[in-house]
A protein has these predicted regions:
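Hydrophobic core of alpha-helical transmembrane segments in multi-pass integral membrane proteins
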Residues: 18-27, 63-73, 104-116, 247-270
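Hydrophobic alpha-helical transmembrane segments
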Residues: 12-16, 58, 97-105, 139, ...
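Membrane-interface helix/loop boundary segments of multi-pass membrane proteins
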Residues: 152-177, 204-211
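Small-polar-interrupted transmembrane alpha-helices in polytopic inner-membrane proteins
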Residues: 171-186, 220
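Alpha-helical transmembrane segments in multi-pass membrane proteins
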Residues: 15-79
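Membrane-interface segments at the starts/ends of alpha-helical transmembrane spans
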Residues: 8, 41-59, 235-249
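Juxtamembrane helix-loop-helix connectors linking adjacent transmembrane helices
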Residues: 31, 38-55, 80-155, 163, ...
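Functionally important transmembrane alpha-helices
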Residues: 23, 27-31, 191-248
């Protein structure tokens, strides 16, 4: 079997396992909900108020955590993804000694800017935020949304899909493919559109460093801010009352600042457009 076939089979396998993970979590939660240790408020699925769902929030939150952790272990066991946090490559980004803080800040600014620019479109989130808000009321849910879930996504889309395909379809092609899949699994335009562009930013950094510290840290910071917004109304509704020109203008400025911060080290176009070495 040729190398290209093996790599694309691994890519398809990782992505399918990720999708299977999403189906497995509620099944595990349903099984745990009958145990006294996981008694609690019933997990409310918006739109299903007239149906009976015997899944409790503690069970759903714990299932998210355990199943995602098992997924990380499975990737490590199969060797399909290299779980490497230290590559030894430069991650300076123009701020000697502070690359992680720099990129985390850049990523959060970029993320907030995209959200502001999309506010005038009034996109539907498919009740995803309502579901995640319930999970964020439990410590296992917070750990899943902020820590383990972000690691799963970085391993799947950056260390997995991007790294496996870049040798065959080039850096740009791999960035687009991994970001598109990353966007699609979010399941709604409210999250998918910013996820695509943020996926490009994360893939770009992984291309430069092959070091998950920066990608994972930035992803953690972004999700932590989202969880905070669930419980702090001024942050959750930031910019909603602004006129459209201000939403788009401030958002575009933040996106420009984030983009400049991402590229400030200098031109990487030569490497970016070059095909990765085999």
């Amino acid at each position: 079997m040729t190398l290209i076939t093996k790599d694309f089979l691994k890519t398809a396998g990782i992505f399918c396992l990720f999708l299977l993970l999403q189906l497995l979590i509620p099944l595990v939660a349903w099984g745990l909900s009958s145990l006294p240790a996981f008694a609690g408020t019933v997990y409310n699925i918006p739109g299903g108020e007239n149906a009976t769902f015997d899944i409790t929030i503690p069970a759903m939150a714990f299932s998210f955590f355990v199943v995602q952790l098992a997924f990380v272990r499975l990737l490590h066991f199969t060797g399909w993804v290299s779980i490497k946090l230290f590559s030894g490559k430069s991650a300076n980004f123009g701020f000697s000694g502070m690359p992680m803080f720099h990129f985390v800040g850049v990523f959060v600014v970029l993320s907030m800017g995209l959200q502001l620019m999309l506010l005038p479109l009034h996109l539907d989130d498919g009740n995803t935020n309502a579901l995640f808000k319930q999970l964020s009321s439990n410590i296992w849910g917070v750990l899943s949304l902020v820590v383990v879930g972000t690691l799963v996504e970085e391993l799947t889309y950056r260390a997995g899909v991007f790294q496996l395909t870049r040798k065959h379809i080039g850096n740009i092609g791999a960035m687009l493919l991994s970001s598109l899949l990353f966007a699609l699994v979010h399941g709604n335009l409210y999250q998918a559109i910013p996820a695509f562009f943020l996926g490009l930013a994360l893939a770009y950094v992984y291309l430069r460093t092959e070091d998950l510290r920066l990608c994972w840290s930035a992803h953690i910071a972004n999700n932590a801010l989202a969880v905070l917004a669930f419980h702090y109304a001024p942050l959750a509704h930031l910019g909603e009352q602004w006129p459209v020109w201000q939403q788009v203008g401030v958002g575009a400025l933040m996106v420009a600042m984030g983009g400049f911060g991402l590229l400030m080290k200098g031109s990487l176009l030569k490497r970016l457009f070059g095909r990765a070495k085999r």
